[in-house]
């Protein structure tokens, strides 16, 4: 009759080996599932931003030249964090109700908002069609009153490429979300090693304008 005793060394080694095998299979699957979830959430967020921009423009609150057509907005305007830019007679306060979640009220110094493993950033056009970022400190006086009525762009890229996401996404006034898988974009320009997409990363043409056609599948 076997006496009551603990595990033998061989039994412990077998258990450890089994756990190691399970971990080797499970951990990559868990990471892949998290990446997929973050990327799916990023696309959904861009669609929400696109919808918010359409609603904001329809109010004509940001009618900088008072021609009856509204312009597109920044995160702070859309979320009700800061007063709508000067221009429209009724644009003397916060957008109420806001058209975008309060989670977008606190962009960093670059104008980037972090959500679910991704950074998001809105660019609005200047007089040459180049992107400027009011959420990052660019004055609204640099935004072109005419072009902003038809043009805007928002990028989403991984906070940590390979760990929080692999793909970079973009949406603009067309409402179509496009993507590329590239390790060019990761983190924030406020961190060492961080590289955010330039305003024209997904746009065709050599003039660096955000008014051109989308270049699907490019790496910027």
Describe the function of each predicted region.
Residues 2-30:
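N-terminal single-pass transmembrane signal-anchor helix
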Residues 29-46:
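Aliphatic-rich helix starts adjacent to a transmembrane/signal segment
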